[in-house]
């Protein structure tokens, strides 16, 4: 399943047409009772960005989101895996418990591989069922089968609980 097809209203289609298409470097892999996100990028920072967008893309069609507001996130971990976990969990918190914020784009501003800290920014808006199609709720991020391949073309595999 390369892209989730959601039934879009004419208003949602109009918003999508207003902005350039999002360059998606992620896919969804089948996993028992959960969903595995697979993201990649030219850099590890881009793979992190794409992993966050894959998570949001499972909840709604991010191309219907307008870049009206910005939110910055700072996360930290004990290693790269825990950093990825907290990065995704902090973004999920902004959606589910805090501001109901859904980004159109997430950009990593700084990734410190020695201190395991990351700063990122998202451009988007408050999730609104009248405006954004409802996908599947993401309940939590898991450490299960998490992989970060930091090679020439970095890849990330992360499982989300739905």
Swiss-Prot record:
GO terms for cellular component: tRNA-splicing ligase complex. The keyword tRNA processing applies. It comes from the Eukaryota. One of its GO terms (biological process) is tRNA splicing, via endonucleolytic cleavage and ligation. Signal peptide: none annotated. Pfam families: Archease. GO terms for molecular function: metal ion binding. InterPro entries: Archease, Archease_dom, Archease_dom_sf. SUPFAM superfamilies: MTH1598-like. Keywords: Calcium, Metal-binding, tRNA processing. Ca(2+) binds at residues 34, 161-162. Transmembrane segments: none annotated. Component of the tRNA-splicing ligase complex required to facilitate the enzymatic turnover of catalytic subunit RTCB. Together with ddx1, acts by facilitating the guanylylation of RTCB, a key intermediate step in tRNA ligation. Component of the tRNA-splicing ligase complex. Belongs to the archease family. This is Protein archease.
